[in-house]
Amino acid sequence: MPVAPTYPGVYIEEIPSGVHTLTGVSTSITAFIGYTARGTVNDPVHIFSFADFERAFGGLDGASPLSHCVKHFFQNGGTDAYVVRVAQGAAAATVTLRSATGPVLDVSAASSGTWGNSLQLDVEYATSNPASLFNLKVTEYIERNGTMVPGRAEMFRNLTLNGFDANYAVAMVNAQSQLIALTKNAALAFAGNGRSTSDTLTLADVNPMPAGYRVAYTINGVGPYEITVPVPTAPGATAATGATAAMNDIAAAITAKSPPGVTAAIVGTNQIEFTAVTDLAHPSERSSIHFFDAGTNSVTARLKLGLANGGTEIDAAATTRPLSTGTTGTVVLPVAFAATGSVTMDVLKGAGALPIAAGIVVPIWGAPTARPVPASLDEAVAQLNNALSGLAPAQPLLAGATAQRIGNTIRVLPGSDDPNVSFRFTVGATATSFGLDAATARNVGHYAPGVGVTALAQMQGAGGNNGMPPAATDLSGNEAAKTGLYALENVDLFNILVMPDATVGAGLMGVLTEAIAYCSRRRAFMIIDAPETVGTFAQAQTWMGSTASPLRSRNSAIYFPRLREPDPTKNGIVGTFPAAGALAGLYARTDAERGVWKAPAGTTANIVGATGLSYTLTDRENGALNPLGLNALRTFPVIGTVSWGARTGRGADALADEYKYIPVRRLALFLEESLYRGTQWVVFEPNDEPLWSRVRLNLGAFMHTLFAQGAFQGKTPRDAYFVKCDKETTTPNDVDLGRVNIVVGFAPLKPAEFVIIQIQQIVQALQT
């Protein structure tokens, strides 16, 4: 860059070289559009292997020609693809979760399909703040050997429904989950205020209070605020009244120095409770108050404020938490551990009031068990787990049931495969101490999208539906909505398009013509199979000579016949499949091995995986179809099944099109896309000879690299290509209009389609 000399000496100035390296784009990124067993609808998914396809779309499916095409693509050399799932009537499994007061969260599977009916959700409060936050676990169950077993699982911790919090459940889950999506229920309403309550204080805690000591806190997520705690007035006649008087002084001082909206009161047994009055801009949702240590001279711990110091903090949003799954009881402290301990429970299903198993007695310790009286609550919970496990053989409905301590609560979770099962406890001494009695908060064992019934804190949603194979309108989609074909608007670059569903039904010619036009716009190439109704040479000849006219494009190639191979989805019965996926893989393999300028045809262009073809063409039949621009698939002894044609949709002899051959057209598309992306730097540069020379330099270097790789005809660069950008291509009028005109020419390599060998006898001269 230019320097500004100010002192005598030597200066270094860096001068731009004018080099902008132009890199060729990929040539074989393939887009597949059509029906799959499952997956997100109208959302392009980038995959790099068939295993990726299986994970995202469910693998091979008898109703999905696309699934077989994707398999063939990767078998034949493809490495990079996008898949757009299109289906009629596809729906995601849903369910609504309730709090103690009403519906709060709508849950849907991440994509449509019956797979979402196998999701189970667990909500529990074992968080950093059990009084305010919740954890959400999502598990996908999959079938394995006839049994549903856990598959993918996700865990989201310390969530809240306060939309202004960093741990806002909807934002956090939707940003990270591959299994579900959350939405706030329309009926969700916030009420009340956030509050922070100290642990029990004594006179020694609050008086005497050293001068200059401080506390820190946030209010409604704003802060932190730090204030100095005043020295309280002299205590009263007794320790209790003295503590109360000192606490009143401290509370009054803190509220006086706080922003408007903070109130304080003495509650319980010598506890200070601070309340954050509703934020008027966002009533109750963000109402909260949290104490923590001040930067210096902190007395937050001495006043037992904040979670870390034994206090409790409950945000207003806590009342909107979805109820914990399972059955949760509040322990009566201190727990009275009698000589024997047991609970009695019923097992219920769904909304039914009548148990499916009633009066199950669960001995926890003492007679008739050999377990000793527990010494602590944690030990009692461990013994409850042992008791539940021990009863499982005789009571199968208790199989897998577990108990968990969360703060001063005990949560008992069913282990049943049925998510609608719940436990109800009946009154008893041990049950009451544990909080596991008739008044216990009972909920379904697991929230279940799609199959969960309306019961307790669960509201039944819609079942997941895979949908049906798409109609023409589904495949074409809508450009404004970016659906169907136009879902590819969300893909930066693709080179090849395959739509197998558009060739397996009636009335789909319009879809193909629209897709070809879209390919022309995106500088892509479409591979098309002759319709499944075209099964013989005569039908192919008739169809190609008339019906296929709308498909004649430089940006398409049409192939006949189809592939045959055993179908794994039908017990290995040999089936017929579109060849487009295998051909796209062949294109990719040829590009990698030889270059985009090599025709994807010939004896080396074998189709991997195919055991045969739906029709066997003879040389004469092939010779009749080739001049029409219909590319043949052939099977030869030893060689196997190969691609035996290299013509575009405009490749009929009668059309005499300059882009008759596939490699010529695909090379041109490669050049166009590469030059388009590689010359963006030219925009807004000064439009004169220095710019034009840099254009010639950079584009010339790119074209010369291709020449050296054998992409063009000619022995010398002059014979093979040219780049022109000067005052002849860009006139003064062009400059005034803001235009730079660049002319790039190339001499394409055309395939040797017909090999003619001339043979003659050598005749000895006759002696006369």
Predicted features along the sequence, with ranges:
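Short, flexible domain-boundary/linker segments around small modular repeats
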Residues: 195, 317-326
